[in-house]
Amino acid sequence: MIEIRVIGMPAPQGSKSFKGYRNGRGIMIESSKKVKPWREAVKWAAIETKVMMPGNDPVVCEMVFSLPRPKSAPKSVQHPFRKPDLSKLVRSTEDALTEAGVWGDDARVVGFGNTRKVFAGGSEQDSMTVPGAV
């Protein structure tokens, strides 16, 4: 098992905005400005960990995203159930791991184990004290 800890605000990768044409091709940019810093944080955490998974073997991922607890959330609420969308958090993180060279293509991911959102500083296993991901 390989573990990478990333400190930073997890950001979903989702919609792209159309910004016109250049050389006959459509220009699409990421709608969220938070994605780039998150992907950079994941990329550098992976590079510092020196994790590489050469070959073409299938991979099963587990990702636990620690998000800040909103002040309006009652203490009885154990998991973040609003935005950001878990599948979009996974997408941005997978793409960053591909950029970092952890694997050649995130198509190698064949399944997800314990992948979830938790509140930072909570009592959940793998919950970080600050926003980030394990």
Cite the ranges covered by each PLM segment.
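Acidic, proline/glycine-enriched N-terminal capping motif
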Residues: 1-134
